[in-house]
């Protein structure tokens, strides 16, 4: 297992999903991983910025990657949308945009060389699942889990390319290594609705409600996702979505790092479970 990474938290971990950052920082040393946060990182520009000014967004992400290169480390992020943006930027730069973008970076005495790879917590754990399994102190044998990949852990497959976007297995493999039971969950590859909340709130709420109700029907004790944006949508908006749907079902939604932490024997509070909106503290 790669032991040291240039950590790109992204905006959401710095504000709205502090429990995600708290939990990954709690599990990293137990797994023997050193996270060095990229000093001076900037927003990846997903959604708004990339639509308004794609060139500026590419420059910003080239800068983020260049900062990691200065650390001589691969980039690790837990946000699937950040993963997609950084991976796409690297691919575009490596295909020939590097010289143009470096002309902008040069104004800040920086340059992109293409030496740092981009990965995610999901991918790192999947690639080292036996090592993860060996560190489990509290097998989650009584826990039924609905795994929810979300969009940007898998799609577009041509940009990410880690595994099949229609028949992925990495997440299930990780959860089973933690000792938990993976329940059949037909919405595991669906969109959570996060990026539709503002332009199409009604549709987003239907997506959220459908996911939660399907998880409940599968008798899952919790939904777990590798993406903090998916977690926010399914957790923070769950109450509103279920009221609109007139559903009484409520299901805790965990970050992948929180589930891993429970299996490693880390106390629930250290994993930020008290920050989750739908009560998840009983799971720990």
Swiss-Prot record:
Keyword presence, Metal-binding: no
Catalytic activity: 8-methylmenaquinone-6 + succinate = 8-methylmenaquinol-6 + fumarate
Membrane topology field: Peripheral membrane protein
InterPro entries (alphabetical): Cys_rich_dom, HdrB/HdrD_reductase, SdhE
EC number: 1.3.5.-
Molecular-function GO terms, alphabetical: oxidoreductase activity
Example of a GO cellular component annotation carried by this entry: plasma membrane
Enzyme category, top tier: oxidoreductase
Locations listed in the record: Periplasm; Cell membrane
Keywords: Cell membrane, Electron transport, Membrane, Oxidoreductase, Periplasm, Transport
Highest taxon of the lineage: Bacteria
Subunit structure: The MFR complex is composed of three subunits: a flavoprotein (SdhA), an iron-sulfur protein (SdhB), and one hydrophobic anchor protein (SdhE).
Main function: Membrane anchor subunit of 8-methylmenaquinol:fumarate reductase (MFR), that catalyzes the reduction of fumarate using 8-methylmenaquinol-6 as electron donor. The complex shows no succinate oxidation activity. Is involved in anaerobic metabolism. SdhE likely contains the quinol/quinone binding site.
Name the UniProt record assigns to this protein: 8-methylmenaquinol:fumarate reductase membrane anchor subunit
Gene assigned in the entry: sdhE
């Amino acid at each position: 297992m790669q032991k040291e990474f240039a950590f790109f938290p992204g905006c959401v971990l710095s504000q709205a999903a502090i429990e995600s950052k708290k939990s990954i920082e709690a599990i990293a040393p137990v797994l023997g991983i050193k996270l060095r946060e990229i000093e001076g990182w900037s927003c990846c520009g997903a959604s708004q910025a990339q639509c308004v000014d794609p060139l500026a967004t590419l420059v910003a992400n080239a800068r983020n990657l260049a900062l990691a290169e200065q650390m001589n480390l691969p980039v690790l992020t837990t946000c699937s949308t950040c993963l997609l943006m950084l991976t796409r930027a690297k691919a575009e730069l490596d295909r020939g945009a590097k010289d143009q973008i470096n002309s902008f970076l040069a104004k800040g005495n920086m340059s992109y060389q293409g030496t740092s790879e981009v990965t995610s917590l999901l991918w790192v754990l999947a690639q080292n699942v036996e090592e993860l399994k060996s560190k489990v102190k509290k097998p989650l044998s009584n826990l039924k889990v609905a795994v929810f990949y979300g969009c940007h852990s898998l799609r577009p497959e041509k940009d990410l390319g880690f595994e099949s976007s229609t028949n992925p297995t990495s997440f299930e493999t990780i959860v089973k290594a933690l000792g938990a039971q993976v329940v059949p969950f037909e919405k595991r590859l669906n969109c959570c609705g996060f990026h539709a909340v503002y332009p199409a709130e009604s549709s987003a709420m239907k997506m959220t409600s459908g996911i939660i109700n399907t998880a409940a029907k599968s008798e899952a004790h919790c939904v777990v996702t590798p993406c903090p944006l998916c977690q926010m949508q399914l957790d923070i908006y769950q109450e509103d979505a279920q009221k609109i749907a007139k559903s009484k079902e409520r299901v805790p939604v965990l970050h992948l790092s929180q589930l891993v932490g429970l299996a490693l024997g880390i106390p629930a509070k250290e994993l930020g479970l008290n920050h989750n909106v739908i009560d998840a503290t009983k799971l720990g």
